[in-house]
Amino acid sequence: MSDKIRTQLGRVVSDKMDKSIVVAIERMVKHPIYGKFVKRTTKVHAHDENNECGIGDTVEIRECRPLSKTKSWTLVKIVEKAKM
């Protein structure tokens, strides 16, 4: 197993599936011509064993072996719960 396990911070955008969440990961990319930094978003499916996440939560996820066709990330911890 590698020493560097990929972890990402993201925001939960869907929790409707059983034991699964969809996490939006934002990154800043420099435009090749104009030089302005633009936000880019990637959505990934992650495994949430206890169904503890809600929409809007900030979470930390890590890469793991493929758990299904689209799921290859798992929840590490909830960094901040969403304000209701």
UniProtKB/Swiss-Prot annotation:
In terms of SUPFAM superfamilies, this protein maps to: Nucleic acid-binding proteins (SSF50249)
Q: Does the keyword Isomerase apply?
A: no
Recite the UniProt keywords alphabetically.
Answer: Ribonucleoprotein, Ribosomal protein, RNA-binding, rRNA-binding
Q: Does the keyword Transferase apply?
A: no
Q: Which residues form the signal peptide?
A: none
Cross-referenced InterPro entries:
NA-bd_OB-fold, Ribosomal_uS17, Ribosomal_uS17_bact/chlr, Ribosomal_uS17_CS
GO MF terms listed in the record are:
rRNA binding; structural constituent of ribosome
Residue ranges the record marks as coiled coil = none
Instruction: Offer a single GO CC term for the protein.
Output: cytosolic small ribosomal subunit
Q: A GO BP term, please? A: translation
Pfam families membership: Ribosomal_S17 (PF00366)
Q: Which Gene3D superfamilies match?
A: Nucleic acid-binding proteins (2.40.50.140)
Summarizing the function annotation, the protein's role is:
One of the primary rRNA binding proteins, it binds specifically to the 5'-end of 16S ribosomal RNA.
Complexes and interactors: Part of the 30S ribosomal subunit.
UniProt family annotation: Belongs to the universal ribosomal protein uS17 family.
In Swiss-Prot or TrEMBL terms, this protein is called: Small ribosomal subunit protein uS17
Q: What organism is listed for this UniProt entry?
A: Vibrio cholerae serotype O1 (strain ATCC 39315 / El Tor Inaba N16961)
Q: Which gene encodes it?
A: rpsQ
